[in-house]
Amino acid sequence: MSDVIMVNTEYIPGKRIVKVFGTIWGITVRSRGLGGNLVAGLRSLAGGEIKEYTKMLSDARNTAMERLQSAAEQIGANAVINVRFDSSDIGQVMTEIVAYGTAVLVEDVTDNIQRVGLS
């Protein structure tokens, strides 16, 4: 399991950003396939959720996130902030899913408060 922290916020509570690497991404492209298109087409006639596409997109998002974590590790980042998703269709049978964010190096915030006394 990866130690890369991934959040969709600009900061991580209890952590301080010490280095910004920049934008990174994880991409996957999935094909619906002829069989999936036929089943989905039949289901769309009846209305409701098309479970085959829901599973495909969920799996694709997980793959994109895994690739985003791997990209962070490869450049020495231990966190990714502002994580977002984007998707687009490529032709009529493929879908691209992108997970992207800002790769950073974070460290724990330590409160080094030194007490000063009057002598």
From Swiss-Prot:
It comes from the Archaea. SUPFAM superfamilies: YbjQ-like (SSF117782). Transmembrane segments: none annotated. It holds the Pfam family YbjQ_1. InterPro entries: UPF0145_dom_sf, UPF0145_YbjQ-like. Belongs to the UPF0145 family. This is UPF0145 protein Ta0182.
